[in-house]
Amino acid sequence: MTETNKGVERHLLASNADLFARREQAVARGVGNMHKLFVERARNAEVWDVEGKRYIDFAGGIGVLNTGHCHPKILAAVEEQMRRFTHTCFQVVLYESYIELAERLNALAPGDATKKTLFLTSGAEAVENAIKIARAYTGRPGVIAFNGGYHGRTLMTLGLTGKVAPYKIGFGPFPGEIYHAPFPIEVHGITVE
């Protein structure tokens, strides 16, 4: 059975294998996938694939779903916001809820110094901005990153990533002044001394 929506055919009874074959034809190879299953729905800490198999979600959107999938309070808040407006680029259109959340986070941050918040759309964007802020504040260009760490897919964050395969092969040269060091784990014989 199929359903057509503006020229795109959607298979209502597709299998994971069928969808992965379509993925191979339509999606760039640079987008890696850890699993070959396609999620159809999710609730709390469980996901169901398109074949109806249930799984426990140990990935949680790589750490961004600490409330679980489809939490009722999150759904209600999103629905309320969507009814008001959906534009989210604060640099173009200002809105009070951005400031309210920044104030709440600033109040939670430790220490007596003045706090300010910057919201970004991805981890890579956050890392790149942290590097820019640190370089501007210190006047020093050097950055230390730990071996084995993963920081993102932009050129700067790939340079910081401490694992060559599969992330960095064929993408250099990377930005300069990035130095890699082993992460201090005493059980591995590496200490902070």
Map each language-model feature to its residues.
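Active-site and channel-lining beta-strand-loop segments
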Residues: 36-59
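Glycine-rich loop-to-alpha-helix module at the N-terminal edge of alpha/beta enzyme cores
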Residues: 11-13, 54-140
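Short beta-strand-to-turn element immediately C-terminal to the catalytic PLP-Schiff-base lysine
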Residues: 48-49, 67-68, 159-161
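A general boundary/transition motif marking the beginning of the first structured unit of a protein
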Residues: 7-11, 66, 93, 159, ...
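PLP-dependent aspartate aminotransferase-fold enzymes
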Residues: 103-193
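Glycine-rich, flexible loop/turn motifs
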Residues: 27-35, 61-63, 70, 84-88, ...
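Active-site-adjacent loop/helix segments that line or gate small-molecule/cofactor pockets in enzymes
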Residues: 2-43, 93
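Conserved S/T- and glycine-rich ATP-binding loop of Class I adenylate-forming
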Residues: 1, 52, 143
